Amino acid sequence: MARSHDTKGSGGLSQRQLRVGEQVRHALAQVLQRGEIRDDLIERTVISVSEVRMSPDLKIATCFITPLGSADPQAVIKALASHAKFIRGRVAPSLAQMKYMPEFRFRPDTSFDNFSKIDALLRSPEVARDLSHDDDEDGGADEAPRNGDE
C-alpha cells in the first residue's frame, strides 16, 4: 500500500524536508561559525541561520539568515550568494548521507521584524483599551463558582 507524500493540500512541509532542513541549517551554521569563508563582510559579521526550507525534491535549500549588528542584510546575502558553491562544498561532508547536495539560496529572515510589529501592536493603547473593555463585558464569567466555594 503506497503512502501519499503530497503535502500541498495540508500546506506544510514533510517530515523529511523538516529533518533535512535542520541538518543543513546546523552544518551551515558550523561553517559560518568556523570562519571558513574568506570574505571581509562575512568574516566581520555574526550571521544567524534561523531556518532552512528544503524543496520537496531536497535539491534546493532556502536559507533564512539574519546578520546581527549593523550589517546590511542585502549585502550579506549577496556575499553569501557569491560563495554559495564554496559553502556547498564545505557543508557536503556533514551531509554525506544525502544523494544530492542541495543548491543554496539565501534570503533575509523577516520573522523577527514581524514579531516586533505584532508586539508593538499588542502594546498599543488602543489594543489595551479594547482588552480592558472586553474584560469588563465578561463580568467575571471566566471565574464561575465551584461546588462548595460559594
Swiss-Prot record:
Residues 126-150 are annotated as: Disordered. It holds the Pfam family RBFA. InterPro entries: KH_dom-like_a/b, RbfA, RbfA_dom_sf, Ribosome-bd_factorA_CS. One of its GO terms (biological process) is maturation of SSU-rRNA. Transmembrane segments: none annotated. GO terms for cellular component: cytosol. It is found in: Cytoplasm. Keywords: Cytoplasm, Ribosome biogenesis. One of its GO terms (molecular function) is ribosomal small subunit binding. The keyword Cell membrane does not apply. Belongs to the RbfA family. One of several proteins that assist in the late maturation steps of the functional core of the 30S ribosomal subunit. Associates with free 30S ribosomal subunits (but not with 30S subunits that are part of 70S ribosomes or polysomes). Required for efficient processing of 16S rRNA. May interact with the 5'-terminal helix region of 16S rRNA. Monomer. Binds 30S ribosomal subunits, but not 50S ribosomal subunits or 70S ribosomes. This is Ribosome-binding factor A. The lineage of its organism: Bacteria, Pseudomonadati, Pseudomonadota, Alphaproteobacteria, Hyphomicrobiales.
